[in-house]
């Protein structure tokens, strides 16, 4: 797992541990994640953020984007208003 997702994952785990789903109803984290209706809005937002983070880690087009090559023919032409000596 990438380091950038680790913090979000820890925050999500902490949120789940302190939610009524796990703390009061004594359900497992897996059960709470399946029934998102029982979770507070903060946990739901962290679930979405964690999923987005994982998707970005796998999306190679966003990880290594190379700038398009410039057309060198246009760059080497002399401007028409320059006098040749």
Curated annotation (Swiss-Prot):
The keyword Transcription regulation is assigned to this record: no
Location of this chain's protein in the cell: Mitochondrion
Main location class: mitochondrion
Keywords recorded for this protein, A-Z: Disulfide bond, Mitochondrion
Gene Ontology cellular-component terms listed: mitochondrial intermembrane space; mitochondrion
Any Gene Ontology biological process: mitochondrial cytochrome c oxidase assembly
CHCH domain: residues covered: 18-61
Motif (Cx9C motif): 43-53
Cysteines engaged in disulfide bonds, as pairs: 21-53, 32-43
Motif Cx10C motif location, chain numbering: 21-32
Region called Disordered, residue ranges: 65-85
Presence of the UniProt keyword Cell membrane in the record: no
PROSITE patterns assigned: CHCH
Database matches in PANTHER family: CYTOCHROME C OXIDASE ASSEMBLY FACTOR 5
Family: Belongs to the PET191 family.
Function of the protein: Involved in the assembly of cytochrome c oxidase.
Record's protein name: Mitochondrial protein pet191 homolog
Source organism of the structure: Schizosaccharomyces pombe (strain 972 / ATCC 24843) (Fission yeast)
